[in-house]
Design a protein with these regions (language model features):
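N-terminal single-pass transmembrane signal-anchor helix
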Residues: 11-38
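Extended hydrophobic/Leu-rich segments
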Residues: 4, 21-24, 123, 257
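Beta-strand/loop motifs with alternating small/hydrophobic and polar/acidic residues, enriched
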Residues: 18, 34-172
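N-terminal leader/signal peptides at the extreme start of proteins
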Residues: 1-13
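Intrinsically disordered, low-complexity regions enriched in Pro/Ser/Thr/Gly and acidic residues
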Residues: 112-314, 329-333
């Protein structure tokens, strides 16, 4: 018994439909590839960059709020009236929302640490012919860490009245703290501020959090009559931003005093010794601990009567209670 086997019949319409489907898939995959590999990285890079610039401005607003409270306290003291504390708040954006489906958000971490970035000021002065020693300190920082995936990862921090911007290849102070040097008749008039932050908290995400501040203590002291061998010490220990402080303070002193000296630099150390002739006027140094990644910055200003002496040292103190969102442990007074 013979069985009939029919030949397969060619159908040009079926071939065209298959080819069309494949081409449509290729176009879709190409378009999807362009979005994932080109559009999303550019979009996220711009978003993360814009976020860092906005956060820098927000930290500047936070500093401005504290500075205004200190000015109000000074005005109240000068007028002999009681300063009523006020609480100010500044909104800070933590991170960046991603592109739905194609990219996840970039979270940031905002941390308030009352023990970070300690500053110490020490010197001797004369009162009624007796030598007295002064030693003051302050600490505390608010830091935003943005582990950007497309833009350069950065940190923005506020410590002792300064706003810093930090990344792996550099750091600098963007908003200056209170530190000034005046030169008159071969004598130096120096002003500096110590600002302590109280409270402890940390929050992570892409939300916008309120950072509140309340100045609860403020005072200003003026010192004069320094011993002929007096040294004014300003030390900044265990800070990620010690190199920024080194450059800022050295530049401030150099712009006013206009002295030559000796500059040395290694992979872990940077130092400048300013001299007037053979006499050392100031010595500033920044040293990196490679284990912790933290700097120690030391500044010593020497009293050299008749050459470049110390006439006045004005030291301002401020204590500020800070709150970060709802995650802050308050300090009771």
């Amino acid at each position: 018994m013979r069985r009939l086997i029919r030949d397969l019949r060619s159908d040009e319409r079926g071939v065209a439909s298959t080819v069309g489907t494949i081409m449509a898939l290729l176009v879709f995959l190409t378009f999807l590839s362009v979005i994932v590999n080109q559009y999303v990285p550019i979009w996220m890079t711009d978003s993360e960059s814009s976020h860092m610039n906005a956060a820098l401005g927000q930290f500047g607003g936070f500093k401005g709020a504290i500075d205004l409270q200190m000015l109000a306290a000074q005005a109240a003291q000068d007028a002999g009236t009681f300063n009523i504390p006020v609480t100010t708040s500044t909104a800070i954006s933590l991170g960046v929302d991603g592109v739905p489906i194609f990219s996840s958000p970039t979270p940031g971490t905002l941390e308030l640490n009352p023990d970070a970035a300690p500053f110490t000021v020490a010197f001797d002065y004369l009162i009624n012919g007796q030598r007295r020693s002064v030693a003051d300190q302050a600490s505390g920082s608010v830091e935003l860490t943005a582990a950007n995936r497309y833009y350069t990862p950065q940190r923005i921090a506020y410590e002792n009245g300064a706003v810093m911007r930090y990344q792996t290849d550099g750091q600098f102070i963007r908003v200056h703290p209170t530190f000034s040097v005046l030169l008159s008749n071969k004598t130096m008039d120096i002003s500096f501020a110590l600002l302590s932050l109280y409270g402890k908290g940390i929050v992570t995400g892409t939300t916008t959090e309120l950072v509140s501040s309340e100045l609860f203590a403020w005072d200003r002291q003026e010192y004069t009559n320094f011993p002929s061998n007096a040294v004014l010490w300003v030390n900044h220990t265990a800070s990620r931003y010690g190199l920024s402080w080194f450059r800022f303070m050295n530049q401030t002193l150099a712009d006013t005093l206009k002295l030559g000296g000796t500059y040395t630099r290694t992979s872990l150390d940077e130092r400048f010794i300013a001299k007037s002739g053979a006499v050392t006027v100031y010595d500033i140094r920044s040293t990196l601990n490679p284990t912790t990644g933290l700097y120690i910055m030391r500044l010593s200003i020497y009293n050299n009567p008749g050459i470049m002496g110390l006439s006045y040292f004005r030291l301002q103190h401020a204590q500020v209670q800070v709150s970060v969102g709802d995650a802050t442990t308050q300090v009771k007074f």
